[in-house]
Amino acid sequence: LLSYATAWQYFSAPRLADGTFATLMPYNVTWLPFTPTLSIDLGILLDPISVMMLIVISTVSLMVHVYSFGYMKGERGFQRYYAFLSLFTMSMLGLVVATNIFQMYLFWELVGVSSYLLIGFYYTKPSAVAASKKAFIVTRFADLGFLIGILVYGYYAGTYTFQPSEMALLKGGATMIPLALGLMFIGGAGKSAMFPLHIWLPDAMEGPTPVSALIHAATMVVAGVYLVARMFPLFIGYAPDVLHLVAYVGAFTAFYAASVACVQSDIKRVLAFSTISQIGFMMVALGVCTSADPHHGGLGYMAGMFHLFTHAMFKALLFLGAGSIIHAVHSNEMSAMGGLRKYMPVTHITFLIACLAIAGIPPFSGFFSKDEILTACFQFSPAMGWIMTAIAAMTAFYMFRLYYGIFWGGVAPRQESPSDESHTPHGNLAGVPHPHESPLAMTIPLMFLAVVTIVAGFIPFGKFISSNGTAYEIHLDWTVAGTSIAIAVISIAIATAMYARAKQPVANALARRFRGLWTAAYHRFYIDEAYQLSLIHISEPTR
């Protein structure tokens, strides 16, 4: 409620004379004074993107907290779970309202610790313990680059603050700013699971499913995007080449993750790679901005932030829907599902809404934000535009492959033992002959997020969030929009033809025909194995 009240008061306040919203610091104290002109403060910064993030984090976190009452009921460590969940939320809220980059780094590390605790919540499972360690180590490696970048930036810029006036007036050493920003992006790439630092995120599915919703929608993985957006004035002004590198890394990551998602059988891992791909879209949107744009790259920046907002809602809906399904069938594998629409109508409809949104079908929210990204990409270069359009088509395909595998086709044999994630007999295992709809504590958040997913696209987002602070009028490019809609519909039609029925001869024939490629994609193109071999080689003594 406090976040909503803050957002209401902030965005309803009169704009400044130059048409921008005021940047406010309602609280700020000096924490570590170094010199008369250089110190580290602790405080609260309110500007359009921090206030927008307050809404995103608070909304998704509230839904996850409510949902968890039903999902985690009867679990051992129930109180511990809520303590870790609240720490996670607090850490992300502290990160987005930080007044300076050192304060951001403090909460950045708290986000990492919180994710470690939640991913390893089932600490008696060796796979969960290994996944939590993997996430912690990979992101700590990336955070070393972030910390070095902060130190380089502070030394040469003479400031750590996020105040626009001070960021615009660097005291010297501007030639070192690209290096500092590049190092900071390494930290952002680790948190946001950009290739090749993405390897921790699929394994993070070992945590409880509501935790996955919070990590993927509103906390850890969007922290890297928020970092690039927060430092955007410096990227666009001093390091445009580094900003373009952000776009290229994001595009490759989006394609790689979409390719892997097309063949996964674990529903949470499909959604995990979907998240990696969609974060790639946000990075591309920020990266294709150029200083030559009269609005200082306004379209890409606005589109990236808009997609962060819409994605948070429909991705939380997808993960919570997946949790409802796992709660019913006690398995993450699509082979244990099929025909569930008959037994879980609320989960079915809400999950379908989220699939339509991420596929970019109007009037759902993902259509509006994704098409603004595609328009920005085409303005940057036709090649980038077509590449991202192709990845959007892959997104529609693998999401409806997932949808049909869960809710259509033949009714799969029901599991006789609970999945590793659950320790409490419920659903089938409690003597119910068929899967059943989840309790109200779980379905109410699904319905709420479904409504938000439908209406969020109609928010005049550019009126509130833009790169230079002034209102940005959104105009759909109907050539781009029409093309992307047509491609999305074709992709959905292909997925329907291949996966809607119980027997899938076309899908099976293609898997046999391209077995090598299918196997490589299923095993994530062996990136994890390559890391393991490299580390073993490095750790062995030279003979």
What residues fall within each predicted segment?
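Hydrophobic alpha-helical membrane-insertion segments
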Residues: 1-12, 142-151, 354-358, 445-460, ...
